[in-house]
């Protein structure tokens, strides 16, 4: 289980999908991408989906996602995404009253019970008191993280100029 904090965008894409029975159908699916802007989010989802789509791909919606963090699972059969709303409990030192602040997370898991277990595993390592006040399965198909392309390829004898033999 690993977690990642970033700027996330929810995107909706429409494309022609080949169904299990071999028929073609136009589907609309939701994905989350890691990006810095709406333009970058659109570019990222087109790049990611172009591998899976043969025909026309239309980005029908982009919106900024409110996820504080996303928990990625390393287990192969964890194929669903759950939206978890947690409330962190703190005590206000001045008024000595309990304060609650809400944060939304996205959790990759096979089932609701496993998603709750993953939340407890990650949050159990912290010193923060919390309550899980909401945990719902989403219609998200996948989450795509930003990958920085390698701009400079390592050369065999990559030596700084001042060390070069002349």
Regions picked out by a protein language model, each given a short descriptive name:
Residues 56-83, 91:
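Extended, compositionally biased
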Residues 34-66:
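Short, well-structured hydrophobic secondary-structure segments
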Residues 104-144:
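Mixed-charge, glycine-accented linear interaction segment located at domain edges/termini
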Residues 2-26, 76-100:
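Short aromatic-glycine-(Arg/Gly/Cys) micro-motifs in beta-strand/loop hairpins
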Residues 74, 144-156:
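Short, low-order "capping/linker" segments at domain edges
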Residues 17-34, 51-54, 92, 97-105, ...:
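A cross-kingdom feature marking solvent-exposed beta-strand/loop segments within repeated
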Residues 153-166:
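Short acidic DE-rich linear segments
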Residues 7-13, 31-32, 41, 45, ...:
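Short, structured motif recognition centered on aromatic/hydrophobic residues
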């Amino acid at each position: 289980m690993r977690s990642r904090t970033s700027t996330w965008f929810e995107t909706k894409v429409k494309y022609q999908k080949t169904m299990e029975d071999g028929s073609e159908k136009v589907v609309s699916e939701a994905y989350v991408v890691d990006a810095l802007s709406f333009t970058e989010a659109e570019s990222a989802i087109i790049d990611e989906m172009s591998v899976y789509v043969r025909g026309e791909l239309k980005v029908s919606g982009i919106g900024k996602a409110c996820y504080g963090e996303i928990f990625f699972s390393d287990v192969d059969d964890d194929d669903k995404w759950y939206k978890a709303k947690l409330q962190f409990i703190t005590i206000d030192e001045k008024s000595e009253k309990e304060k609650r602040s809400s944060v939304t997370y996205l959790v990759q898991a096979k089932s609701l019970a496993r998603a709750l277990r993953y939340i407890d595993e990650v949050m159990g390592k912290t010193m923060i008191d919390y309550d899980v006040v909401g945990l719902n399965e989403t219609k998200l198909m996948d989450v795509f993280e930003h990958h920085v392309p390698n701009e400079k390829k390592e050369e065999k004898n990559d030596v700084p100029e001042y060390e070069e033999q002349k």
